[in-house]
């Protein structure tokens, strides 16, 4: 499939890992130009973008066919936890063209149209289209570090992508103007529209580092760090899992809360005394189902942050 050939166009080296990709198209064949809002999500990462639900993705093989599955977890206030509790599981075959629906709306503040489709793929590197002008890319990094080795989630919009705030109903269009400056058009009930400059970048090859303190989310030890939806910047998390950033414009802040499910040696050392200090309990443990029905050992988790 021609669309899959685009996966070979990555120009940046990333750390090795499995990323589940939701590559957007405007037709049920997932052919032609990539168009809409897409995702590239690290396998096993427990995350919440809008602080309403938590999600976790895994890959599996059944009868020789590969597929991805994900679970939507109810979110406890102040906690990002993904425990298996007999919850409904969504799935899609790798290489299939998957129709957008409420269970694939991972950011309610930027809900995408129901007529959008996703090409489902799995790669060892995070994917986003590098051959399109006017890309707006949001990156979420692991372990509080903004570097190539910590990319956990990528959320991107092609030029003129339309979305809607699922809470307020405000319609939004993301675009880059003739001067290659990022903007968001907001409309109320299809009228009273106005343009808002954004502090993201318009670039087909987005840099994976924090470009400005003014537009970065906090990297504190709190439960989550915030990012501005408009011109406002997010506040740093606090040691007791305190505040998050909220954006201007639509009034709905863009949040991020990720817990990495990888087994990190430095986290093991840092968390040796967690049982003796409940106030610093910024991690939980999980049990990951293996492909053959077994259970792997628990892994340490750690808080991630947003970078632009």
UniProtKB/Swiss-Prot annotation:
The keyword Glycoprotein applies. Its main location: secreted. It comes from the Eukaryota. The keyword Glycoprotein applies. Residues 1-17 form the signal peptide. Residues 267-284 have a biased composition (Low complexity). Residues 213-308 are annotated as: Disordered. Residues 217-231, 239-252 have a biased composition (Gly residues). Keywords: Glycoprotein, Secreted, Signal. Coiled coil: none annotated. Glycans are attached at residues 13, 91, 159, 210. It holds the Pfam family CfaA_B_C. GO terms for cellular component: extracellular region. InterPro entries: CfaA/B/C (IPR021837). It is found in: Secreted. This is Uncharacterized protein DDB_G0290387.
